[in-house]
Amino acid sequence: MNPCNNITITPEIIAQHGLKEDEYQRILTLIGREPTFTELGIFSAMWNEHCSYKSSKKWLKTLPTEGKCVIQGPGENAGVVDIGEGQCVVFKMESHNHPSYIEPYQGAATGVGGILRDVFTMGARPVAAMNALRFGAPDHPRTRHLVSGVVSGIGGYSNSFGVPTVGGEVNFDKRYNGNILVNAFVAGIAKTDALFYSKAQGIGLPVVYLGAKTGRDGVGGATMASAEFDDSISEKRPTVQVGDPFTEKCLLEACLELMELGAVVAIQDMGAAGLTSSAVEMGAKGNLGIQLNLDTVPVREENMTAYEMMLSESQERMLMVLKPELEKQAAAIFHKWGLHFSIIGKTTDDLRFRVFHQGEEVVNLPIKELGDEAPVYDRPWSEPVKKTLLKAEDVKKVENLGDALLTLLNSADQSSRRWVYEQYDTLIQGNSLICPGSDAGVIRISNKSKRALAFSSDVTPRYCEADPYEGGKQAVAECWRNISTTGATPLAATDNLNFGNPEKPEIMGQLVFAIKGIGEACRILDFPIVSGNVSLYNETNGGAILPTPTIAGVGLLSDWSKMVTISGMQNGDHIILVGDCGSHLGQSIYARDILNIDAGAPPPVDLQLEKRHGQFVRDVIHNGFVHAAHDISDGGLAIALAEMVIKAGKGIKAKLSNKSPHHAELFGEDQGRYLLAVKPEALNNLKEYAQTHAVSLTELGQVEGDSLNIDGIFTLSVESLIQAYENWFPKFMGEE
C-alpha cells in the first residue's frame, strides 16, 4: 500500500488543502467514494484559483480576445499574434507573487523560468522580457531585502538564460508590505506554420517526461499561491521552487530541436501543480485519458511518495505526447543536451486520469472534471463607491513648484530605476533598440529585418483603488500610449490581474469593474487580450493589496529606422503638447507625495480621444515630423518635461497656457496626452495634420539651453534634475 494513501482524510486535512466543505462534497459526489490522499492533493491543485480561475473565469470570458492579427487567444500556454512575413510573436505575463515574498531570489527567478517555458513550449525562441514589481513602503523593514532578492533573482535567471530585459515597472506602497507583486513577461518569435499546442491527440501514444529531475521543491506551491498569508508565512518556504537557468537554456534548445524534428504531438510545461497540471490539461483539452507510471519518473530524492511526485513544482521540466516512430531520435536530442527523456505513460480513450506507483493504482479520477470542467463560481460582488472629481482650485498650490518637482523626481515612485535595470542584461542577443528607462522597450525582429517589436507594461494601482473601472481603462490606455510613442502600432495585450480575497464582495467588485474597464478599452483601442494570469488572495492578516491589473502590450514597427525615443530631441525643436492642458489632480502623485492627501476620483479616460491622439502620434512619427515623443502619465506635464530633459541632456524653455492654475497644469494627470519634440521645418505640417484630424495642440516652447525653464515659475538646471532623479534608488539600497 502506498504510504501516503494510508492517511485518513479529516476536515483539517481538507482545509489545509484549501478546499471548502462544499467542494469536498462535490468531490465525493463526483467519484462516488472518499479520495485517496494523493487524489485529494490533485483536486486541491487543479481546483484552486491559480489553476482553475474559478472566481474570475465568468468575467474573463467578457474580454475581447480576437482580432485580425490574433492566431491564438487565451487558453494556451501563451497568446500568439501574427507579425507578417510568416512570423508571429508569442507572449504572456504571469505572477509569482507569493513565492517571491517567501523566498525573494528563488521566487522571482523561477517566475522568470516559468514564463520562459510558457513561451518556448509553443515553439517560440524568447527574445524579450519585462517585469512589473510592487513592493511595500520604503521604510518597511523587509522592503529593501525583498527588492534586493527579487531584482537579483530576475537578473540571475534571465541573464544566464540569455533573454534581454527591455522594460518594466517598480512601485512602492504600504499596501504591498505583506504581499509584494512580481509579474513577469516574456515574448518570443516563432514561425506561424510551426506552432505547438498542449491539446493531446491520438490514443495509445507515449507520454514523455523531459528535462530536469523531480524533487520535493515546490510541493503544494499552486495551493499556497491561492491562499492568504498569515503569521505562519515562514513555514511556507519549502513550497518555493528552485531554478537552474542553465538547464532551462538546454531545455529550450532541446525542445526547439525536437519540434524541428516533427516529433511533437502535444507539449506542456510543468508549471503550477507540476506533473498533475500538465498531464490533466493535455488530456482534458484533447478529450483523452492519461495513464502515468511514476516508477519511471526521474527523481533526485529518495523515497518520494506519489503525492510528492504529482505535486512537485521542480523547475525546467516538460511533458510531451510523442510520435512513437521518432522516439529514438527524440531521446538522442535530449541526451545530447544532458537532459532526461523518459516515457512515463500513454494516452487513453477512457477520459480517466490514472496514476500507478510501485505496482499500485494511486489515482483514478475523471480527467475533464479535473481540468476544463473544474468548479466556476459567480461570487457576490458590490459596486465600488465612486469618488467625486476634485477641482484644481480645491487642491492646495505649494509655494515653490520647482521644489515640488525636485521632490517628486527624488521620490520612491518617480525616481530613476537605473539601479534595477542595470542588473539586467538588456543587450544580449544584439537586437535591443530601446532599453529600459523609456516609455517602451524595442527590439529588432532580426538583424536582417526592418521590422521591430515594442513592449510596455502599465497600471496605476491608486487609480484602480479609487475607481476600478477607470483604473482598468487607464492601464490599457497607458500601455497603448507607451507603445505608440515609439511609432509602433499596438497589436495585442496580456493581463495579470492581482487582487485580494475574492470571497469579500468589495474585493470581487474591484475585480469585476477592473475587467469591465479593461474590456471596454481593449475593444475601442483594438487591443485584444490574448493571454494572461489572475492572482487572487493577495492579503496578509486580512489586509489586501491595492487592486493591480497589470497590462503588458506588444506593438509592431514596420520600419524601425523611423522609430523615435524619449531622448531624441534636438536643439531648436518645438515642444508640442498633444491634448488638453492639465487640470485633474485627484489621485495624482502631486496630491499624494507633496500634499499627503488621498482624495478625489482619478482622471477619466476618453477612449475615443485616446484612439485619435495615438493614431496622430504614430502618423507624425512615420511622416518624420518629430525627433522625440513621450506620454504624459504619473506626475503630469512637469514630470514628463523633466524626463525628456534628463534623457536628452538638453534644456527646454516653456510657457504654460494659463488655462488652469499652475499647479494643475504642471502636475495634473489628465489622460490621452503626449509631448512631441517637433523638427522646426515640420512644425507647420504637423499643425495642418492636427487640424485635419481634430487633434488639439499646444505650443509649449523649444529645446534650448541647459535648464528646464517654465517661464515665470521656475528654472531648474539639467544637472539638478538628473541628480534628483538618479539619487533616490542607490541611496535607498545603501549604496551611497
From Swiss-Prot:
EC number, UniProt record: 6.3.5.3
Pfam families, per the entry: AIRS (PF00586), AIRS_C (PF02769), FGAR-AT_linker (PF18072)
Localization of this protein: Cytoplasm
Binding-site positions, ATP: Y53, K92, D495, G532
Positions contributing to Mg(2+) 1 binding: E94, N533
GO biological process terms held by the UniProt record: 'de novo' IMP biosynthetic process
InterPro entries: PRibForGlyAmidine_synth_PurL, PurL_linker, PurM-like_C_dom, PurM-like_C_sf, PurM-like_N, PurM-like_N_sf
Binding residues annotated for substrate, in chain numbering: S95, H96, N97, H98, R117, Q241, E313, S314, Q315, S535
Chief localisation class: cytoplasm
Active site: H50, H96 (proton acceptor)
Keywords: ATP-binding, Cytoplasm, Ligase, Magnesium, Metal-binding, Nucleotide-binding, Purine biosynthesis
An annotated Gene Ontology molecular function: phosphoribosylformylglycinamidine synthase activity
Gene3D superfamilies for this protein: PurM-like C-terminal domain (3.90.650.10), PurM-like, N-terminal domain (3.30.1330.10)
Family that this chain belongs to: Belongs to the FGAMS family.
Subunit structure: Monomer. Part of the FGAM synthase complex composed of 1 PurL, 1 PurQ and 2 PurS subunits.
The protein's name: Phosphoribosylformylglycinamidine synthase subunit PurL
Originating species: Bartonella tribocorum (strain CIP 105476 / IBS 506)
Source lineage: Bacteria, Pseudomonadati, Pseudomonadota, Alphaproteobacteria, Hyphomicrobiales
